[in-house]
From Swiss-Prot:
Function as written in the Swiss-Prot or TrEMBL entry: Involved in DNA repair and RecF pathway recombination.
GO CC terms: bacterial nucleoid
One GO BP: DNA recombination
Source species, domain of life: Bacteria
Keywords: DNA damage, DNA recombination, DNA repair
Listed name of the protein: DNA repair protein RecO
Family that this chain belongs to: Belongs to the RecO family.
NCBIfam families: reco
Designated gene of the protein: recO
InterPro entries linked: ARFGAP/RecO (IPR037278), DNA_rep/recomb_RecO_N (IPR022572), NA-bd_OB-fold (IPR012340), RecO (IPR003717), RecO_C (IPR042242)
Disulfide pattern: none
Keyword Ligase: no
Length: 245
């Protein structure tokens, strides 16, 4: 008879680990089809455990587990390979990916697109992509796929974004046509050219100006979504957002 709530061979990543009881680990995982939740890896801290070299952050895994409720039990884990271990600044950026994912997602709320956004960001960091590009893409796209922020193809009036116009991006709302370009934006708002919004909507970060505009937009969106103290280290967020290619 199969175990209750058993799931086999599900793509996933480990977001956080901590010791659990004498020899086990408590894992916070992000799975493709089941969202974010907690798993117990029994005896994973024993010296001869096969899991010791597998349960690593920022590595694509295939996870199997059983059980229901808030805490499930890991049955098996396999390393999918193909991703270089993160070190140095990419590793710090990886911790930021994890913290932002845990802040913006609810447990047991599956969103396969969020998993894809995370997977792409990890692979970009491991593959030597420009760090600021990888992070800005992750921030903006994650907010969009989770339903917190809009697509950037249309404005607040429902009209197509025009490349030759400027728009006010306020909080995480649709861009508003800028009717008063002579006035400086006030509050949690940034003025951006339509050309930049269209580039971001097309996932085109090739131009340095576009990457700079992405940084401004991500600051506005994350400030609206996370509040005044969004992360354990506010300085870490500020340092990462100041990166430039």
């Amino acid at each position: 008879m199969s175990q209750p709530g058993r799931v086999d061979k599900q793509p996933g990543y480990i977001l956080h680990t901590q010791p659990y009881r004498e020899t086990s680990l408590l894992l916070e995982v992000l799975s493709r089809d089941h969202g974010r939740f907690s798993l117990v890896a029994r005896s994973a801290r024993r010296p001869r455990s096969d899991l010791r070299g597998v349960l690593l952050p920022f590595q694509p895994l295939t996870l199997s587990w059983f059980g229901k409720g808030e805490l499930r039990t890991l049955h098996a884990a396999d390393w999918d390979g193909g991703v270089r271990a993160l070190t140095g600044l990419p590793l710090v950026c990886g911790f930021y990916l994890n913290e932002l994912m845990m802040k913006l997602t609810a447990r047991d709320d599956p969103e396969p697109r969020a998993f894809s956004v995370y997977d792409r960001a990890v692979r970009e960091l491991a593959g030597g992509a420009p760090l600021s590009t990888a992070l800005r893409r992750y921030e903006l796209r994650l907010a969009q796929v989770l339903g917190y922020a809009p697509a950037l193809s249309r404005d607040s009036r429902g009209e197509a974004i025009a490349a030759d116009r400027h728009y006010l991006c306020r909080d995480a709302a649709l861009p508003e046509p800028d009717e008063h370009p002579e006035l400086a934006p006030v509050g949690r708002v940034v003025r951006l050219p339509g050309e930049a919004l269209l580039a971001l909507d097309a996932d085109d970060y090739r131009e340095p100006a576009t990457r700079g505009h992405a940084r401004l937009l991500s600051r506005v969106w994350l400030s609206a979504l996370l509040g005044d103290e969004p992360l354990a280290s506010r300085q870490l967020l500020q340092a990462i957002q100041s990166l430039s290619d």
